Amino acid sequence: MQDLRWPTYAVRDLVLEGAAPGRDPEGRGCAYVVDTDGNEYLDGVGGIGCLPLGHAHPKWVAALAEQAGKIAVAAATFPTAPQRQFVDLLLERSVVPDGRVFLANTGTESNEAAIKIALRATKRDVIIGFERAFHGRTLGSIAMTATAAYRDPYVSCLGEPDERFARMNVARAVFDDLESVEKLFEEYGERVAAVFVEPVQGEGGIHPASKAFLLGLRRLCNEHGALLGTDEIQCGSGRTGNFDAWTTIVGDDPKDAPDMAWYAKALGGGFPIAACVAKAGIAEHMSKGSHGSTFGGNPLASAAGLATLQIMDEENLFDAAADQLPTLHEIVAERPHRRVAEVRGLGAMLGIEISGEGEPAAPLGDILQDEGLFVTVCKGKTLRLLLPYRADETILRDAWARIRRGLDKLSA
């Protein structure tokens, strides 16, 4: 069957059918899928981090079905019961103290909301971002994104700190290098509105920031009157063992908290919902009509998000997620492979760096699909695994066995 979408994706040579029959006997969400030819795969992509519960968790499915029978969409001027409940739970969990929320649909939308509120609240025009960063592909977000291939075709619309083509300008520092951030503050001074950081870089290759670095960003922003925003789109919503990756790395002291944090991906358990949370004193700088979203926080999405947060609590999924990286370290140590340079990450955000010149991991997406495992490859060097939070030792051993076979093929 011909794929008639724009050629913006490296489309896999298969058509997915659904969750694999018999692979979820306890009814807690499935880590395996089948295609229309009946082939089974362990899904280590998970919609790129969107499936914390796995596929077809019965309680999540039931919550969506029940809400679909009531009301699916309402204009944002009409609050709904699931939206109110979802927002209450979200703000209880978010690292941002005394938060107020803007609801959207996708990660890049929540990042755009963060850009708008940072510029509006500070009346400044420079945002500091980082090398290897990924924040989305809409124009504001792509200005923050470090990948030149994504950004450069649109540079005339984006601007740089001394090219006044745009109202927002991006200065880029080195990730986990506080001195490089200090130099940008020295250069741009009171023009700096905010620093945007991923506590764990995902697209950039699964790189966690250090506690000292994140606390240093907090200090610099305090000293210069800038806002600190954390992009929790991929690393947040429980994936690292706490609701926010910031909390996993830094802790939960309110004085260290960021001013803003934004979420998507895992937040809806597989249904699109996103949120940008800002401190109340920052959020008050927005006014009626200053931002909006037709579908943001719609009843279906809110029901999905609410069910996801409730299931995470009921099934202790944050604790389960936290166990994944140490478990994988043990498994790889038992049966190492010479092509593995490093296993790193945080919680259920797993990266396996492959040794070799150039982009040694690039062929592994196709090779591992033939082995019955879906992965993504970051920067040509690192395999990224974003499994359901409850993926246990058995599933991780299965993943590693398939990866070892793939590495043997790569090395042949």
Features from the language model and the residues they span:
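Conserved N-terminal phosphate-binding loop of PLP-dependent enzymes in the Aspartate aminotransferase
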Residues: 1-412
